[in-house]
């Protein structure tokens, strides 16, 4: 059950020859979500093979380089004959701006579009096994959110060898005990689930910051994350500029990753001055947090489960 993250746009503020502006897709069990939708996102989706059958789009904030692609994306979906509803999630007090952007050109969509405002600290439940949590970031006073994609804990690993030793026939009884039910065998023995099933296992956690200064909100949300996607607009030599504009340097992002104990850091939102050559940013970040990658348009990150489930009974 891999989880696939695709970087559709990795530039800061404006597109360059090498990079489009902000957009990230996440695909899990056939469902695709989009985080931010900078101009030209629908073309990037075509280019990198991302399905247009999105269920939701999450905006970190509504600055133009994260927003202006939604008009074209909705138009493309309408031309493709979409009828399914689409939900757009956006920070508190930004729905009006988002609605105005959608209505540019005066064309109606062929499907319902629902706009939902979110507060920091809220949670969007996705079925029974994962959710999307919001957290506060610091982008020079702009209404902004970061998002944490959080899978619920999974059942512990089932021990098939011990089950056979105990004389439990393979089949429905294995599934019942793995779901936590005690079972009674024909000889009257009662076997508790804890005998055959290990401790519950953590789900995956992916954190997307959007535009931000280093902040406590990100640090808390990123604790033990499998993947932290942090903006990195500038190198350390432009630290004053980063502070002035509400952005982060590569070193600052790496320091957050180190403090939070994340497994992997991917940097995005790269200033045009580094668009072709990101070596300085990469070296700066890796000097603090070695497991760092600077994303390019088309970069894919696949996160497998920490343990294979092939031997798990149904």
UniProtKB/Swiss-Prot annotation:
It is an enzyme of class 3 (hydrolase). Binds 2 Zn(2+) ions. It holds the Pfam family Lactamase_B_2. The keyword Hydrolase applies. Gene3D superfamilies: Ribonuclease Z/Hydroxyacylglutathione hydrolase-like. It catalyses: Endonucleolytic cleavage of RNA, removing extra 3' nucleotides from tRNA precursor, generating 3' termini of tRNAs. A 3'-hydroxy group is left at the tRNA terminus and a 5'-phosphoryl group is left at the trailer molecule. It comes from the Bacteria. Zn(2+) 1 binds at residues 61, 63, 139, 211. Keywords: Endonuclease, Hydrolase, Metal-binding, Nuclease, tRNA processing, Zinc. Zn(2+) 2 binds at residues 65-66, 211, 269. Its EC number is 3.1.26.11. Signal peptide: none annotated. The active site is at residue 65. One of its GO terms (molecular function) is 3'-tRNA processing endoribonuclease activity. The keyword Metal-binding applies. InterPro entries: Metallo-B-lactamas (IPR001279), RibonucZ/Hydroxyglut_hydro (IPR036866), RNase_Z/BN (IPR013471). Its cofactor is Zn(2+). Belongs to the RNase Z family. Homodimer. PANTHER family: ZINC PHOSPHODIESTERASE ELAC PROTEIN 1. Zinc phosphodiesterase, which displays some tRNA 3'-processing endonuclease activity. Probably involved in tRNA maturation, by removing a 3'-trailer from precursor tRNA. This is Ribonuclease Z. It comes from Gemmatimonas aurantiaca (strain DSM 14586 / JCM 11422 / NBRC 100505 / T-27).
